[in-house]
A protein has these predicted regions:
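Conserved beta-strand position repeated across blades of beta-propeller domains
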Residues: 108, 162, 207-209, 260, ...
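Conserved beta-strand positions in repeat-built beta-propeller and related beta-rich domains
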Residues: 115-122, 163, 168-175, 215-221, ...
């Protein structure tokens, strides 16, 4: 007696087993609860299956692989809390050194392990280029040197920064103007002024980002302003093209600060909060929040430095990494967000090929 179709039968059995065990989505699990950061004596918490696998930190960075999650009702710093939009979990992937004297107002990732950072402070506002992995400052310019104040006037306070092609735009807080630098040399090409104060116009400069077409600006209110960068450069006046009010379930969300455009959404720091709001640029609706107040427990103690509010968001589109830090923070964190999972319905799974009749002899 000889069995001629054993390989085909074995393939059929494997197909049946796999389709019955893996074809359907899992049942919903209970809501996640807050997971505290690891202490010095605890091992890091293993990541949940909803996150991408942790990356290996480059030289100078430390892989933390710490799972952190916050329930939707939990407050952030200074009693901040969601009005109704959900709070997303996140995971700390790595930590990098950050200048604890930097009063961070703007943060950008340019690739090649390089950050651009704009800082505030009346006497120490800067635009600088920094190596992410080491925190080393490659070059910098001081606002008080490239844009000295008028005699008797207060110094200029630097704010958000954005890169548009070979130019860098930087805002000032209350001086009524911004600067446009040549990206290669860090020399000032031009100043641009804010329009006269009005009900629909930005009065102060806070956060700045670029969506590939428009600059996006915040002024500490609930408004986001859309700006034509080329017209701004050509005219020397902020060229406003539109605006949107940011709301969470109908409630205006004020004090929008540093901004970053990420995958079609605007991520905004909220001043005096350790929250980041994810905003739909078309409607202004807050889609989700990140409550990053737990990052404070991971900051090393630095003599003579008291970390202030979370501020600074940079996105690495190539590596799909989100980088965050704060004012006078000695660390910068790479965080990962949950990955949406999809499942193939059983009806779409290709049926096995028809069986060949068995031949016995």
């Amino acid at each position: 007696m000889r069995f001629q179709s054993f390989p085909r039968l074995l393939g059929l059995l494997l197909t049946v087993l796999l389709s019955t065990g893996c074809g359907a989505p899992p049942t919903p699990s209970a809501p996640r609860t807050a997971v505290p950061p690891p202490s010095a004596t605890q091992q890091p918490v293993a990541p949940t299956s909803g996150y991408p696998a942790p990356a290996t930190a480059p030289a100078g960075g430390t892989t933390l692989d710490t799972a952190l999650s916050t329930p939707a009702s939990a407050p952030g710093a200074a009693g901040c809390r969601s009005q109704g939009a959900p709070v997303s979990p996140y995971r700390v992937v790595a930590t990098y050194p950050h200048d604890p004297t930097a009063y961070t107002e703007g943060l950008l990732y340019l690739g090649a392990d390089t950050l651009y950072e704009g800082t505030g402070d009346w006497q120490n506002s800067l635009l600088r280029e920094v190596t992410l992995s080491s925190g080393q400052i490659k070059r910098e310019v001081k606002l008080r040197e490239v844009a000295p104040p008028q005699p008797g006037a207060q110094a200029n306070f630097g704010e958000g920064v954005a890169v548009v092609g070979d130019r860098i735009f930087q805002l000032t807080w209350q001086s009524g103007f911004g600067l446009i630098y040549d990206r290669a040399s860090f020399t000032v090409l031009k100043r641009f002024t804010y329009p006269p104060a009005g009900i629909a116009l930005p009065v102060e400069g806070w956060g700045l980002s670029y969506d590939g077409t428009r600059l996006i600006m915040s002024d500490g209110t609930a408004k986001l302003y859309f700006i034509d960068p080329e017209a701004t450069f050509n005219t020397g006046v902020l060229a406003l093209t539109g605006q949107v009010e940011v709301r969470d379930t109908g409630v205006p969300i004020t004090q929008l600060n540093e901004l970053e455009y990420v995958k079609g959404a605007i991520y905004a720091n909220l001043w005096n909060c350790d929250l980041i709001a994810r905003i739909d640029p078309a409607t202004g609706a807050v889609q989700t929040y990140l409550d990053l107040s737990g990052l404070r427990t991971l900051l090393p103690i630095t003599p003579n430095v008291t970390p202030e509010v979370l501020n600074g968001i940079a996105y690495d589109a190539t590596g799909d990494r989100l980088l965050v830090t704060g004012k006078w923070w000695p660390s910068l964190f790479e965080i990962a967000l949950p990955v949406a999972r999809t499942y193939l319905p059983l009806a779409l799974v290709a049926p096995p090929p028809p069986l060949t009749p068995l031949h016995w002899s």
